[in-house]
Design a protein with these regions (language model features):
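Acidic/histidine-rich catalytic neighborhood
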Residues: 52-110
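Flexible glycine/proline-enriched surface loops and loop-helix/loop-strand junctions
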Residues: 6-8, 78-86, 148-151
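Conserved functional hotspot residues or short segments at active or partner-binding sites
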Residues: 47
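Carboxylate/His-rich catalytic cores and anion/metal-binding grooves
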Residues: 1
Length: 184
């Protein structure tokens, strides 16, 4: 049986991390092959356009510091919900926005191109919201979004949300502090 949280809609239109996931595959080709021509002519134009879009999509919050990402829908959980309650600052979106913006800065600096775009990308990447965390019996865990307490019911993909920081953005790895690894 399918989880009642899934429904026929255009929810995937708001899964903003998916373009970043695709970009990561392209970046990994460059990263492993080191083909500068590939970076300059193929990867960079896509990465640059995606970073420009991500910077424009992020909205500065009322505090004047944090950039919020809404509407966003987690790919593994919480489709479009009533009054869009579960569509703000999703973990996968935060992870991939930060990853894309950081790689765009790195590539622009390496290639010596579009230096004027770097400050805006850095500002957004450094001021994205913290990952939503929730206390559970075993400690703190990363949740799908800031309004959605993790659900551990049949049909839900709860286990993937915390792993986004490992398998999508590489923010948590073997060299990370133990307290970060414990949240996965």
């Amino acid at each position: 049986a399918q989880s009642p949280w899934y429904m026929e809609n255009n929810a995937l239109d708001f899964t903003m991390e998916v373009p970043g996931q695709i970009m990561k595959c392209i970046w990994n080709f460059w990263d492993y092959m080191g083909d500068e021509e590939f970076l300059r002519t193929r990867a960079w134009p896509i990465l640059k356009d995606l970073a420009i879009f991500y910077e424009a999509f992020a909205r500065r919050g009322w505090d004047g510091k944090q950039f919020n990402l809404e509407p966003t829908v987690e790919t593994e959980s919480y489709g479009v919900s009533y009054q869009l309650k579960y569509t703000r600052n999703c973990t996968g979106t935060i992870a991939m926005f930060r990853w894309v913006l950081q790689r765009a800065c790195e590539a622009a600096e390496y290639l010596g191109e579009d230096q004027d775009l770097i400050p805006g990308w850095k500002e957004v990447a450094e001021n994205l919201p913290p990952y939503p965390k929730f206390k559970v019996g075993s400690g703190e865990v990363v949740g799908a979004n800031e309004m959605a307490f993790p659900r551990f019911t049949r049909g839900d993909h709860f286990m993937f949300t915390g792993y986004f920081l490992v398998n999508q953005s590489d923010e948590i790895n073997l060299d990370s502090p133990q307290e970060l690894k414990d949240m996965m």
